[in-house]
Amino acid sequence: MISVALIILFLAKVISGKSDDFISVNPETNMLIDGYGRERFFHGTNVVVKHFPFHPETTGFNKDTFSEDDMKILQKFGLNSIRLGMMLPGYVPKREEYNETYIKVIQSIVTTAAKYGIYTLLDMHQDVFSPKFCVEGMPDWIVNTQGAKDFPMPLHKPFNLDPKTGYPYPEDCAKFSWADYYFTEAAGQAFQNLYDNVDGLRDEWAQFWKKTADVFKEEPSVIGYELINEPFCGNVFKHPTLLIPGVADYLNLQPTYDALQKAIRQVDEEHNIFFEGVTWDFFEVGFTEVPGGKQYQNRSVLSYHYYEPPDFSKKLNFEARLLDLKRLKCGGFLTEMFTVGTDFNSMFEMFDLCDKFKQSWHGWMYKSYGCIEQNLGCLNMSSPGKESIQIANTSRTYPQAVAGRTQSYAFDIKTKVFTLVYETVGSCKSGRTIVYFNKNLHYPNGYRYEINPNFKVTPSENEYFLYLDEVNKVPNTVVTFKLFPLSFTDSEDIHPVTVMGDKHLSENHNENEKKKK
């Protein structure tokens, strides 16, 4: 007989929307799911520190922090996920020497973020491999350019090196855009030697991921491990066909990812592995299967990015990625797109398409964290107070957990109307759907909702969420939920009222009436 204590514990998890189970993938629907079988959606931001100490400050609040103050801001604006830089030079500054202090800081960020309902994707970030190539990513010991001309040939004659660092001088690096340095022999050869396991370098990379996974293997708030950010194709001077979309994915990345996956699975069979193709896979990616093969489809997520340029069509990009997901039978996640700057129309268009194609996303980026080339962070430190964070622009009404099969959802940034349609399924162990909404930002005069059929709708105590609970658990029921803002006129004239019919529930929540009481 099940004990009363166990029943209470289970109900507490359902009510809070939390679970001790890991996020996984339904290979047939390509959706991320939790332990209750609910489809899960994530909106978030990147937290990546590309220079020493390779992690953010964890106390206080300033341009270099990711502390509990920052986490509270993300929670308020409905950002339930971060893509956190899990940096190879931070954890393994010297070959076979692991910095345990670094991993403890990363671990503390993960566990503290979980207290605020924030999940973490651990991202081994790099851009053009190394500071030796004017950018960042890998520690010096893993940079092997054997067989290549001196950097940055053929882009330019060899740069002089700073004798203190061994790196090119910043004024020389500034002569070209950082992305141009991918097309140097030295950078391409460094990638190629890593993929080919020259001097056992790929084995060392695999060991990095094995040790990382061993630390986080029991942490359910970790969505997964992203093996490498924006991998380059390899040495295109010796193998120019690698520039053909899909070729490098199959020839270089797929066997490399299999090797990394094998190392991770020695200690962690539960977490998702996020894998990414080259950045110019405008159409189909070149992978023939997920890392590790078909048996890992339910723990594999294709990571992809969108920037214009080099990308050229938002809609075509999503359509191509959905075809990849169906073919590979894995999940998908847009792990980078611009959520900074002033082109809000383009950003809102991306958000609308993410809703349409039911894709989770991470914006680039939360703060600049001192990175000169990426000094486009969301934090405006010239304005007083934490509310100057422009990340409010990313706050949208959306479902964080859906107790069934999501058919569609959409948020209109102009009217603030939100619509969710889903079908209940018998295999779902929870009847609770969770909708995030920013009451102060989008519904300052109050809100009303309509739901069909007659489900119970309850706001959370902190009024960040609306809970949609099945009254009678009936599979294959199509549920339609709509949320509307009250206008100023409405808020003066309409009193809170609940109207119930056979299949329809409508309720107004009036801020002015609440204040009068």
Swiss-Prot record:
Keyword Ubl conjugation appears in the UniProt entry: no
Family annotation (SUPFAM superfamilies): (Trans)glycosidases
Main location: secreted
Compartment list: Secreted
Tagged with keyword Ribosomal protein: no
Catalytic activity from the UniProt record: an oligoglycosyl-(1->4)-beta-D-glucosyl-(1<->1)-ceramide + H2O = an oligoglycosyl-(1->4)-D-glucose + an N-acyl-sphingoid base
CC annotations in GO: extracellular region; membrane
Signal peptide segment: 1-17
Catalytic residue list: 230
Protein name per UniProt: Endoglycoceramidase
Species assigned in the record: Hydra vulgaris (Hydra)
